[in-house]
């Protein structure tokens, strides 16, 4: 297989959903159908103690949510698929956003009983903003939920995107019989003991079966004919432009509808995309020179070795272990000899990767999120990854003053991997941490204790709004007020932390020559 064929075989996507919609379950079942894992067990193992493949961090195992982004690669048919299992909690939008910068498509998982939920909407907007094609898997059809047309209408109205159902459910909950495949005109029964049923062009059963006289079957056929009469053909270009989402019904927990989805996904999902540089030049995946960017850094994936891994998306060409690359931020050459792939906490050495692949680079502190690595004589850097403005701030210190070394090492590593944002007061050097949501602080506290053996003391600062300053040279000492704190971020930029919107507006009126701005 030549380089062009290798790149065309890559499919890289993220799975997005609201917590408990079945995202991690779907991830596991995709791995199961690909043969990447031997057993697809129940993911939600709070009683059994059995944990999902993609939830490897201890706090994830304890709480049953994904709070980091795992990367899994597997072969299916003639394709090599990279799945990024995004954080499944609403507090982790910043890490999720960075993950979505590294994919070419997304799979949106929706609970049929709940429809579009807040986190789903938030993540969808990020995908829409980036023009990422979205596939929809409506999950838990073996439970009672909303009617199919109601769910499609909700997706179209709430998300402002057209839908195209690729299959259609027959019944729901206890009366769930199976799904009708629109393309093959077949009915796949939910129960294993049933055989595949076939329909003619008029949706009449070719075989004799008791379901023929069932009201749920009759309703499903009527609905399917209504969908067909709408006359809208599947438009792959609209999918690739982010204007249409193909919709699949199924039950991930029951292994039902997942393989049908996977088959359709590899047929219709985009191959690796070009990526824009800071100079607004598109770098094609087929460029022969290697390039890639770091979108995530994760410390202590293996607690025994206290390792640190930088997650890199290969943008163009081919990566070969041992190759020389240039880290553009420092303009220094380096030889990459330690590279790894992932299956959650299982890792193996990567000798070769091409555009679209996600690989891990062992990091001794060289890399930062957003770094560009290039081979050959290329000089460009990719556009920076956006940063979110925190909404919660805490003073933090070590409970035991004898643990200062471990305390500062832990904070440095967790800040570098993007788990938390770092600020420091100007005169007292008090460390203040910022987060998008409360759970980030809980995870930070847990990891400091579990990975660095440091108990931390955290105290709310009473500030909710962070604003950066465009004209830093105009800052004066008298600008600190009882309702604001002047701090520096990890890059030494000045930042004002304000108590509330009123305090922000008061400052802007009093010091009108100071130009404030926020991040995303």
Swiss-Prot record:
Q: Where is the tr-type G domain?
A: 8-277
Residue numbers binding GTP = 17-24, 85-89, 139-142
Any one GO molecular-function label of the UniProt entry: GTPase activity
Localization of this protein: Cytoplasm
Q: Name one Pfam family in it.
A: EF-G_D2
Indicate yes or no for the key word Cytoplasm. yes
Q: Which InterPro entries match?
A: EF-G-like_DII, EFG_III/V, G_TR_CS, P-loop_NTPase, PrfC, RF3_C, RF3_dom_3_sf, RF3_GTP-bd
One GO cellular component term: cytosol
Q: Which GO terms describe its biological process?
A: regulation of translational termination
Alphabetized Gene3D superfamilies for the sequence = P-loop containing nucleotide triphosphate hydrolases, Peptide chain release factor 3, domain III, Translation factors
Entry superkingdom: Bacteria
Q: Which UniProt keywords apply?
A: Cytoplasm, GTP-binding, Nucleotide-binding, Protein biosynthesis
Q: Which family does it belong to?
A: Belongs to the TRAFAC class translation factor GTPase superfamily. Classic translation factor GTPase family. PrfC subfamily.
Q: What does this protein do?
A: Increases the formation of ribosomal termination complexes and stimulates activities of RF-1 and RF-2. It binds guanine nucleotides and has strong preference for UGA stop codons. It may interact directly with the ribosome. The stimulation of RF-1 and RF-2 is significantly reduced by GTP and GDP, but not by GMP.
- What is the protein's name according to its record? Peptide chain release factor 3
């Amino acid at each position: 297989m030549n380089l062009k064929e290798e790149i065309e075989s890559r499919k890289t996507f993220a799975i997005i959903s609201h917590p408990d919609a079945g995202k991690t379950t779907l991830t596991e079942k995709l791995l199961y159908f690909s043969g990447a894992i031997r057993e697809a067990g129940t993911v939600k193992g709070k009683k059994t103690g059995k944990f999902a493949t993609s939830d490897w961090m201890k706090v994830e195992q304890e709480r049953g949510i994904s709070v980091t982004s795992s990367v899994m690669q597997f072969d299916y048919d003639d394709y090599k698929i990279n799945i990024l299992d995004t954080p499944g909690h609403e507090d982790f939008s910043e890490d999720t956003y960075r993950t979505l910068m590294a994919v070419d498509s997304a799979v949106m998982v929706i609970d049929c009983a709940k429809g579009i939920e807040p986190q789903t909407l938030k993540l969808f907007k990020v995908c829409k903003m980036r023009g990422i094609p979205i596939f929809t898997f409506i999950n838990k059809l073996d439970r009672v939920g909303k009617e199919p047309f109601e769910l499609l209408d909700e997706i179209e109205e709430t998300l402002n995107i057209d839908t195209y159902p690729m299959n259609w459910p027959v019944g729901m909950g206890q009366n769930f019989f199976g799904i009708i495949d629109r393309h093959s005109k077949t009915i796949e029964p939910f129960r294993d003991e049933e055989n595949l049923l076939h329909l003619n062009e008029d949706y009449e059963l070719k075989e004799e079966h008791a379901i023929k006289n069932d009201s749920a079957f009759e309703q499903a056929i009527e609905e399917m004919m209504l969908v067909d009469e709408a006359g809208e053909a599947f438009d792959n270009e609209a999918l690739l432009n982010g204007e249409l989402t193909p919709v699949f019904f199924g039950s991930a927990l029951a292994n039902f509808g997942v393989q049908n989805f996977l088959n359709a996904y590899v047929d219709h999902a985009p191959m690796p995309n070009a990526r824009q540089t800071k100079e607004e030049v598109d770098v094609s995946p087929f460029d022969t020179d290697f390039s890639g960017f770091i979108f995530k850094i994760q410390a202590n994936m293996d607690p025994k070795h206290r390792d640190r891994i930088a997650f890199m998306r290969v943008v163009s060409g081919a990566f070969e272990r041992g190759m020389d690359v240039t880290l553009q931020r420092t303009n220094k050459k380096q030889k990459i000899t330690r590279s790894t792939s992932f299956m959650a906490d299982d890792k193996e050495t990567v000798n070769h990767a091409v555009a679209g692949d996600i690989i891990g680079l062992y990091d001794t502190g060289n890399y930062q999120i957003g770094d560009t690595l290039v081979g050959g004589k290329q000089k460009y850097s990719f556009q920076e990854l956006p940063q979110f403005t925190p909404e919660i701030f805490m003073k933090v210190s070590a409970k035991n003053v004898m643990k200062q070394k471990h305390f500062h090492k832990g904070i440095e590593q967790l800040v570098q991997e993007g788990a938390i944002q770092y600020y420091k007061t100007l005169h007292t050097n008090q460390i203040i941490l910022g987060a998008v949501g409360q759970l980030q602080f809980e995870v930070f506290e847990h990891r400091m204790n579990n990975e660095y053996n440091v108990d931390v003391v955290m105290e709310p600062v009473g500030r909710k709004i962070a604003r950066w300053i465009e004209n830093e040279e105009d800052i004066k000492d008298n600008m600190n007020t009882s309702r604001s704190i002047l701090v520096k971020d990890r890059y030494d930029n000045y930042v004002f932390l304000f108590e509330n919107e009123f305090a922000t507006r008061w400052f802007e009126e009093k010091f009108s020559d100071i130009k404030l701005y926020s991040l995303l």
